[in-house]
Amino acid sequence: MSSGANITYASRKRRKPVQKTVKPIPAEGIKSNPSKRHRDRLNTELDRLASLLPFPQDVINKLDKLSVLRLSVSYLRAKSFFDVALKSTPADRNGGQDQCRAQIRDWQDLQEGEFLLQALNGFVLVVTADALVFYASSTIQDYLGFQQSDVIHQSVYELIHTEDRAEFQRQLHWALNPSQCTDSAQGVDEAHGPPQAAVYYTPDQLPPENASFMERCFRCRLRCLLDNSSGFLAMNFQGRLKYLHGQNKKGKDGALLPPQLALFAIATPLQPPSILEIRTKNFIFRTKHKLDFTPIGCDAKGQLILGYTEVELCTRGSGYQFIHAADMLHCAESHIRMIKTGESGMTVFRLLAKHSRWRWVQSNARLIYRNGRPDYIIATQRPLTDEEGREHLQKRSMSLPFMFATGEAVLYEISSPFSPIMDPLPIRTKSNTSRKDWAPQSTPSKDSFHPSSLMSALIQQDESIYLCPPSSPAPLDSHFLMGSVSKCGSWQDSFAATGSEAALKHEQIGHAQDVNLALSGGPSELFPDNKNNDLYSIMRNLGIDFEDIRSMQNEEFFRTDSTAAAAGEVDFKDIDITDEILTYVQDSLNNSTLLNSACQQQPVTQHLSCMLQERLQLEQQQQLQQPPPQALEPQQQLCQMVCPQQDLGPKHTQINGTFASWNPTPPVSFNCPQQELKHYQLFSSLQGTAQEFPYKPEVDSVPYTQNFAPCNQPLLPEHSKSVQLDFPGRDFEPSLHPTTSNLDFVSCLQVPENQSHGINSQSAMVSPQAYYAGAMSMYQCQPGPQRTPVDQTQYSSEIPGSQAFLSKVQSRGVFNETYSSDLSSIGHAAQTTGHLHHLAEAQPLPDITPGGFL
C-alpha cells in the first residue's frame, strides 16, 4: 500500500522475505524452545497451504504469510460459489458416470476457459456489495500490471481513481441509490475506503435477478502500473448484478444471511488496442537482475519466448552477454540512468534467444529497494516486431551523439576495440566468412578486462550469433537460367550478320551447358553450409540428392535438343509461334533502329527458328514446281520496318513498276530468310520495263536492313476503297476469285509520265494467285493528293537478282510516297497516310517510266 493525503492506491505487494541460511547445529545438542517449535510448525503448515493454491510456482514462491491466508480464504469462497451455481448432475453425485470421462471433460473446459480469456479484450472482475474483489481473471496483469494474487480479496477502491469511487459505489447498489449519506460517501476517499455495507437485503426486498435494470454499463479509471499509461487507465465496465451464492455469511445475531448481489462485469479499455498490441499482449515477461544486471530469475513467459530455462539464464554471468553488441552502450546508458533515478525508462534493444536468434524487446527496468537500500532490478520486456525495432534503431542513430547503433563508440580509451562483427558493411555470411578471417590480428583477451565490463561480455559472446544465414541458392530450373542468359545480350552483339539459325541454337546450347556445369559443382559448391540450409533440409526430407538433380538436368537438355532436331518434320500448322517470340523480335528491331547513326547503320541479320525456315522453303519450292495457269508473276517481298519520326515531303514512287504500301508503325510480322528470286519476262512490250539492272554489284553494300513478309503474289482481288484488308497472320488460303487477263493490268496502270501517282477509287482487275499476309491490293494510278508531312521509314534489302534496282534507288535517290489509308498496313485503320522514305543522299534522279510489277 502507498498512502497519501487521504488517498490510498494499490501498489506492488510485499513479497516473501529471502530465506535465511540454516545455521549449523551446535555440538552440545539442540536446546528446547517451545516458541520456536510453534513457529516452525506454523511455517510448515503455511508452506503446505500455499502449495495447494491454484497459482504457478513462481507466484507461490513470492507470497508472504498474510497473502497465503488471504488467497486461501478467497479460493474457498469461490469454490463454494461454484458448487452452488454450477450444480452437478444426479449421475455425478451418485458416481454413476465414468470418473475418467469426467476428468477429460473438466480438462477440456479448463482449456476452453483459458482460450476465451486470451481472446477477450479485457478481464473479468467480480465485486461484492461490500466492495471486495471476489474474483479477477489472470489477464488483469496485461492491462493493469497487477498480479491476480495482488487484487483478489482486496478493496476495489484501491484500484479506482479517487474521483470515480463514488460512481463505482453507486453502480454497486441495486437501485443506483446507496443508503450512505453525503458524509458517508465522502468516506470513500478515506484511506481505508468506504465502510462495509451494514444493510443486508432478503430476496423479497430485491428484484428478480434477470431484470433489465440490473444490467450495468459505466466507465471509470483504474490504477495501472504499465509503462504505456499515465498511471491510470480508463476502462468500460459492462455486466449485471447477480446473486453471490454459497458464502454462508452470518449476521450479528448468528443467523445465516441470504445471498447478496455482486457485480459481474467485463472491464475493457476504452481505447481499442492496435493489432500489434493484441498480438503481443500475452507475451509481456519479467526478469530479475542483480544491480550489475546479472540475471537471477525469469518468469514462465520469458522462458517461453527466449527459449532458455531459468538455470541457463542465471549461470551465464553478466546479462550483457544476452544483448546485441550494437545495443550494449545504449542499454548501459539506461542502466546508469536507472541507478541514479530508480527507473530506466523505455529502452529498445535486441535480446539473444536460443538457437542464435535475436528478439527486439521494449524494456523498462525499476530499482527495488530493501531497508532503504537498492536490492535488485525488475525488468519488464514487451516483444516487438522487426519493423518496430528497426524504426527505433533509426531514431536512436539520429539522436545520439555517437553511433550506439553500430558500436563505433570508443570504450576503455582504445580506438575501435570491436572486432569486424560490428562492421555494418559489408554484410558477412557464413559462406564467405571463416573463424580465422573473423579474428583480428591482435584480439584482446578476456582476462585483460573486468569480468563485469561490457568488453568482457562482448568477448565472451560467440561470433556465430552475428553471422547472417547464407542467401538462398540459385534456382535449379534450366529454363529460368537460359531465359535470363538470352535476355542479357542483344542479337546484334551475339551473332554475325551472315549467321543462320544454327548459330542461335548453338549459342543457347552452349549457355545451357555452362549453367549445368555451374550447377553440377556438387554439394560443397552449391550449398556452403548444408546442415543449416533450408533447401538442403527439404531435399533431404524428400529423398532427393544431387545426383537426381543432375539426372533431371540432363534429361531436360536432351529433350530440348531432340525437339529442336526434329522440328523440321513437324507440320506447319502444328508450329506454335507464341507471343513471346514475336515480342522478342519486335524488341530486337526497336533496338537495332535506335542504333542508327546519320546515314550509316550496321547490318543486322534477323534470325528465326529453324522450323519456320525449313517449312517456308518447302512451301516455296512446291509453288515453283507447279505449272502456272498463266504467265507467272515474279515473287517479291514487302518489307515493314520501324521508322523514326521525321517529317519530310512525301512523293509517290514506283519501284520496279509496282506500288508498295509501307507501314509507318512497327507491326508484328514474320521474319523469313531471303531466297533467290527468278526473273520472268512478263510485260516485254511495255516501255521502261527493265529486266536487267546495271546496279547488281552494289546489292551487298546497301546499309539497310529489311523485314520481309512472305508472299507469292502481291495482287489481290478487287476491293472497294472503303474496305480495309485484314488477313490473318497464321492461316493462309488461296483466293477463289476468277482469273483475268494480264492486259487488264496494263490498261489500268499506264498513265502519263509527267503526273504524280496517287490512288483512285476505281478498283483494278487482278490475277488471283495464292497470297499471304503482307500482300496489298493494287489500284489505278491517279494524281496524288496534297503533300503532307509524314513519318520516315527506313529499309534496306539484301537480296540478289531483280532487287538490284531497288537497292540502287535506296543508295542514290530520295523518294517519298504518300498513300491513302486504304493501303495502310493490316489492322492500322487510324493511319491516314502511308509513306516510304529512303534515307540516302539527295541526288536528282529522272522520272522512272511506270512498268513492271512486284
UniProtKB/Swiss-Prot annotation:
Residues 37-65 are annotated as: DNA-binding. It is found in: Cytoplasm; Nucleus. Homodimer. Heterodimer; efficient DNA binding requires dimerization with another bHLH protein. Interacts with ARNT; the heterodimer ARNT:AHR binds to core DNA sequence 5'-TGCGTG-3' within the dioxin response element (DRE) of target gene promoters and activates their transcription. Binds MYBBP1A. Interacts with coactivators including SRC-1, RIP140 and NOCA7, and with the corepressor SMRT. Interacts with NEDD8 and IVNS1ABP. Interacts with BMAL1. Interacts with HSP90AB1. Interacts with TIPARP; leading to mono-ADP-ribosylation of AHR and subsequent inhibition of AHR. It comes from Mus spicilegus. This is Aryl hydrocarbon receptor. Residues 440-451 have a biased composition (Polar residues). The keyword Repressor applies. The PAS 1 domain is essential for dimerization and also required for AHR:ARNT heterodimerization. Pfam families: HLH, PAS, PAS_3. InterPro entries: AHR/AHRR (IPR039091), AHR_bHLH (IPR033348), bHLH_dom (IPR011598), HLH_DNA-bd_sf (IPR036638), PAC (IPR001610), PAS (IPR000014), PAS-like_dom_sf (IPR035965), PAS_fold (IPR013767). Residues 346-387 form the PAC domain. Residues 1-38, 425-451 are annotated as: Disordered. GO terms for cellular component: cytoplasm; cytosol; nuclear aryl hydrocarbon receptor complex; nucleus. Mono-ADP-ribosylated, leading to inhibit transcription activator activity of AHR. Residues 111-175, 270-340 form the PAS domain. PANTHER family: ARYL HYDROCARBON RECEPTOR. A motif (Nuclear export signal) lies at residues 63-71. Keywords: Activator, ADP-ribosylation, Biological rhythms, Cell cycle, Cytoplasm, DNA-binding, Nucleus, Receptor, Repeat, Repressor, Transcription, Transcription regulation. Ligand-activated transcription factor that enables cells to adapt to changing conditions by sensing compounds from the environment, diet, microbiome and cellular metabolism, and which plays important roles in development, immunity and cancer. Upon ligand binding, translocates into the nucleus, where it heterodimerizes with ARNT and induces transcription by binding to xenobiotic response elements (XRE). Regulates a variety of biological processes, including angiogenesis, hematopoiesis, drug and lipid metabolism, cell motility and immune modulation.
